[in-house]
Amino acid sequence: MSPKRDGLGTDDGLHSQVLQEQVSTGDNLHECDSQGRSKDTLVREEKTYKCKECGSVFNKNSLLVRHQQIHTGVKPYEYQECGKAFPEKVDFVRHMRIHTGEKPCKCVECRKVFNRRSHLLCYRQIHTGENPYECSECGKTFSYHSVFIQHRVTHTGEKLFGCKECGKTFYYNSSLTRHMKIHTGEKPCKCSECGKTFTYHSVFFRHSMTHTSGKPYECKECGKGFYYSYSLTRHTRSHTGEKPYECLEHRKAFGYHSAFAQQSKIHSGGKNL
């Protein structure tokens, strides 16, 4: 006996159900819309997949499956060098470039390279002069969204993300999440060599180097070694004189983000980045 096919939960069943409904109503499946697409094509295009946990909707089942990893906590992509794991391959590849120093995204104007396309797109605004973020209060325009957010606070005084434990405020939720570990005592990063635990992954990774090869990134100018490629990049500016962080209030440039952030706090009333 062949299994009963009620069509529930299958693509074929869903499509058959749609066909039956259209036959009963007399709809013409092969009638075209204004763009030349038949109705059966439109039915297939509009089929959606909904997450039962949060209600997010996707047009492909594969996207839903990938999204559900956020709720399940599954992180199948693990980088062996540091042990950090990611739910999606794109995040894994992005993290891997921190270790390898790979920067595949190149600016066609000045040949400067970046490890992320989003960083390149932001940087290109220096050449184009584009300032897409405009303050509705004073009319000032900004190239970067982060700088725009910092400026906006000077008008509104809004506290974007506040710690309920100590009242400290932050521009970004990720900064608040990182800060909260101070209060919870959470130390999710454990060294497999000696058993030590760490609150922050960056500190854990630096510690793990004491068991292995030390500092893999070396400055060609002075020979100083670093744990991370971005630390080497930051150090290199002391030789080149590059100052990529500009305060738009006073047109002052900085070689390090920490110095730029300190200057920004002066304008924003002391709020942390």
Curated annotation (Swiss-Prot):
Pfam families: zf-C2H2 (PF00096). A zinc finger (C2H2-type) spans 49-71, 77-99, 105-127, 133-155, 161-183, 187-211, 217-239. GO terms for cellular component: nucleus. Keywords: DNA-binding, Metal-binding, Nucleus, Repeat, Transcription, Transcription regulation, Zinc, Zinc-finger. It is found in: Nucleus. InterPro entries: Znf_C2H2_sf (IPR036236), Znf_C2H2_type (IPR013087). Its main location: nucleus. One of its GO terms (biological process) is regulation of transcription by RNA polymerase II. The keyword Cell membrane does not apply. Gene3D superfamilies: Classic Zinc Finger (3.30.160.60). GO terms for molecular function: DNA-binding transcription factor activity; RNA polymerase II cis-regulatory region sequence-specific DNA binding; zinc ion binding. May be involved in transcriptional regulation. PANTHER family: ZFP14 ZINC FINGER PROTEIN-RELATED (PTHR24399:SF75), ZINC FINGER AND BTB DOMAIN-CONTAINING (PTHR24399). Belongs to the krueppel C2H2-type zinc-finger protein family. This is Zinc finger protein 80. It comes from Pan troglodytes. The lineage of its organism: Eukaryota, Metazoa, Chordata, Craniata, Vertebrata.
